Design a protein with these regions (language model features):
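An alpha-helical support segment within catalytic cores of ATP-dependent transferases
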Residues: 5, 10-15, 128-140, 145, ...
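Regulatory N- and C-terminal appendages and interdomain linkers associated
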Residues: 1-23, 31, 293, 298-327
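Active-site activation/catalytic loop segments of kinase-like enzymes and analogous catalytic loops
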Residues: 153-162, 223-258, 270-290, 302-309
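ATP-binding pocket architecture of kinase catalytic cores
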Residues: 25, 34-149, 153
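Secondary-structure capping and boundary motifs in well-ordered enzyme cores
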Residues: 146, 190, 195, 219-220, ...
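Residue-level recognition of alpha-helical structural elements
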Residues: 56, 105-109, 168-171, 266, ...
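Hydrophobic packing residues in well-ordered alpha-helices of helical domains and bundles
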Residues: 60, 109-116, 147, 172-175, ...
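Active-site acidic catalytic loop and adjacent metal/ATP-binding pocket
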Residues: 30-37, 46, 180-227, 234-237
Length: 327
C-alpha cells in the first residue's frame, strides 16, 4: 500500500477496519483514487494528491460546499489530511452515466438526461443567488484569454503533436484570426455558474440519482457551456432528436429571460465548436505527452461534432478549409 495511505488510515483510526485498498481508474489529472473496503461500514474513496494540500483553500472543497447549497448531489467530504495530501470521500460506486447507458432502457436514458439537464438549469438559477467572491468559481471565467488558450492548446497538441501538422506562418495567422472571432463572441455573453466538465463520465449513478463529480474547475461562462458538455459529449452518442428535445427541456426550465430557440441553438453550436476543439487538444496531449492512448477512441466522435458545426455555418468556411486536412 502507498505509505501515505497507510499513515492516513492509521490517523483516521481505520486500520483495523480496513479489509482491502483498491486503486481506481483516475481521470486526466495527477490525482490518484483508491477505494477502501471497511468492515461493518460503507466503503470510502481516498483521493491521493501529488503532495501536501491546504484543505481550506482547495477549490474542490469550496465548490463542493457551493454545489451542496444549490442543492445538487455531490460526494460528501468525510475527512482529510493536509500533510499527507489525502481527502476521504463518500464512495459513489463505479457506475458513470456513460457506463450505465449501455444497460439503460430508453425510458431510463431519457429520465437520466432530463435530470442532468435539470441540474444545469438549477445550478445557473441558484448559482446567481449564491454568488459570492468567497467561492472560487465567481472569481474566474471563460474569458478571452482562457478560451484562446484552449484553442491554441488544440493547435499545439492535436494539430501539431498528434497529427503532425506543419503549419505555415500564414496558416497560423489565419487560425488566430478565426479564434479571435469565436472567443470574442463567446466571452461577451452573459455569464452563469458552469461546472466546466459536465459530461457523462463526471456524472455518477448512485442510490437512483445522478451525482456530480470533478467540479473543482467550476467557473463563470456562457449559459450554453455545460449543456454543450453534456449533449456534444466526446464519450456518448446522442441522436439529433434527443439533443433537440433536451435543448427544449433546458429552455423550458431555464430561469430569467428565455432566448428564442433558434438564437440559443446558434450560440450552442458556437460553444460546441470551441469546446470540442479543446477536447481534441486534450486527447492529443494525453496521447503524445502522457503516453495514454485510451483517449484515441473518442477522437472520431469529437471530430464529427466539429465537422458538423463547421459545415453548418457559412461563417466557418475559411476555418473549415484550414482544418480540413486534419479532420
Amino acid at each position: 500500500m502507498e505509505p501515505r495511505l497507510e499513515q492516513y488510515l492509521a490517523e483516521q483510526q481505520l486500520t483495523a477496519q480496513t479489509q482491502q485498498v483498491m486503486p481506481l481508474t483516475g481521470d486526466a489529472s495527477d490525482r490518484q483514487y483508491f477505494r477502501v473496503l471497511l468492515k461493518n461500514a460503507k466503503p470510502i474513496v481516498l483521493a491521493l494528491h501529488a503532495g501536501p494540500i491546504d484543505f481550506g483553500s482547495m477549490p474542490f472543497v469550496a465548490v463542493a460546499k457551493l454545489l451542496a447549497a444549490v442543492p445538487v448531489p455531490v460526494p460528501r467530504i468525510l475527512h482529510h489530511s493536509d500533510r499527507l495530501g489525502v481527502l476521504g470521500l463518500e464512495d459513489l460506486g463505479d457506475v458513470t452515466l456513460q457506463a450505465h447507458l449501455g444497460a439503460a432502457t430508453a425510458t431510463e436514458h431519457a429520465a437520466l438526461y432530463r435530470q442532468a439537464v435539470g441540474f444545469i438549469a438549477l445550478m445557473q438559477q441558484r448559482g446567481e443567488a449564491l454568488r459570492s467572491d468567497a467561492y472560487p468559481p465567481y472569481r474566474i471565467a471563460f474569458d478571452v484569454e482562457k478560451l484562446t488558450w484552449e484553442l491554441e492548446f488544440f493547435v499545439k497538441h492535436y494539430l501539431q503533436a498528434y497529427k503532425g501538422a506543419a503549419l505555415t506562418d500564414v496558416q497560423r495567422e489565419a487560425l488566430r484570426e478565426e479564434w479571435s472571432a469565436i472567443v470574442e463572441e463567446l466571452a461577451s455573453e452573459p455569464r452563469v455558474l458552469c461546472h466546466r466538465d459536465y459530461h457523462s463520465r463526471n456524472l455518477m449513478l448512485h442510490d437512483d440519482s445522478l451525482y456530480i463529480i470533478d467540479f473543482q474547475d467550476a467557473r463563470m461562462g456562457p449559459d450554453t457551456y455545460d449543456l454543450v458538455s453534456l449533449l456534444r459529449d466526446s464519450y456518448v452518442d446522442l441522436s439529433a432528436q434527443q439533443v433537440d428535445g433536451l435543448i427544449a427541456y433546458f429552455l423550458a426550465h431555464k430561469s430569467g429571460d428565455v432566448p428564442a430557440e433558434g438564437e440559443f441553438r446558434r450560440r450552442f453550436d458556437l460553444m460546441a465548436l470551441q469546446r470540442n476543439l479543446k477536447a481534441l487538444g486534450t486527447f492529443g496531449y494525453m496521447t503524445t505527452s502522457r503516453n495514454n492512448t485510451v483517449y484515441i477512441q473518442y477522437i472520431p466522435r469529437t471530430l464529427a461534432h466539429v465537422r458538423t458545426n463547421l459545415a453548418k455555418y457559412p461563417r466557418f468556411e475559411r476555418l473549415l478549409g484550414l482544418l480540413e486536412p486534419w479532420l
